[in-house]
Regions:
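C-terminal ends and interior cores of transmembrane alpha-helices
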Residues: 82-96
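Juxtamembrane intracellular "pre-TM" segments in multi-pass secondary transporters
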Residues: 1-17
Length: 227
């Protein structure tokens, strides 16, 4: 990876690498706390709901060659970065009134968020790196994104969750105890309920409102950072 550091002499690559690292800081918010968020909003099978993102990722992965020709590397990376901002804003503003379509749309954006930024970024790195250091350049990109970026991100996101959401979310989870089916489900049954949301009308409105307000505040932070 030492030889690949010389690529930082190229301003465009240096900007790309720094931006990639910075984008991965708010990315940790999504990876760490989306499941908690979905359960608090009322989704019965949060893990299954998040597979919408993986489905979207596969779909857009197949379309990358098409968009690569039509849009080019820079536009695709820019769209990917903007998609991250939009996702966090959808989560933030979908929280207070539990607007389900906004939350689902935010999850479905994963294909654009990941493929347009990260996959295209790897393709860009592979394209501009000299053949002799191509593997080192790819390793350096992983180090800056999934290494430095996510490490900082998990620390920042964890601290923010503890200071903003943790207390009110714990109160909400206690109030939600017993709501919905408690039966054990097979994997297929869990996937079939990826869109299912519990009715939270029986939950104390003050507890629910406070928790959702805190989730709104929580998701605003990564939206600002990604912007």
């Amino acid at each position: 990876m030492v030889d690949a550091i010389s690529m930082f002499k190229r301003p465009a690559f240096a900007v790309f690498m720094i931006c990639s690292c910075l984008v991965c800081i708010p990315l940790a918010y999504y990876y760490s706390f989306t499941s908690n968020y979905l359960r608090s909003v009322g989704f019965t099978q949060a893990a299954s709901t998040m597979t919408i993102g993986q489905m979207s990722e596969i779909f857009f992965m197949l379309l990358i060659p098409f968009f690569f020709r039509k849009l080019g590397v820079k536009n695709m990376i820019l769209i990917g970065m903007l998609a991250w901002v939009l996702r966090y804003l959808l989560f933030a503003f979908g929280a207070e009134e539990q607007v389900i379509w906004m939350i689902l749309f935010g999850i479905a954006l994963h294909g654009i968020c990941y493929d347009f930024f990260f996959v295209t970024g790897f393709m860009y790195t592979d394209k501009i790196a000299p053949k002799s250091i191509r593997s080192q350049a790819q390793s350096m990109l992983v180090f800056f994104t999934q290494g430095i970026g996510l490490y900082i991100g998990y620390k920042v996101a964890g601290d923010k969750f503890s200071s903003v959401v943790k207390e009110s979310d714990a109160a909400l989870n206690t109030a939600m105890a017993g709501i919905g089916s408690q039966d054990e489900l097979s994997t297929g049954e869990q996937l079939a309920q990826m869109f299912s949301v519990n009715d939270l009308s029986e939950v104390d409105s003050n507890i629910l409102s406070t928790a959702m307000s805190k989730w709104n505040e929580f998701w605003i932070y990564p939206a600002i950072m990604a912007g």
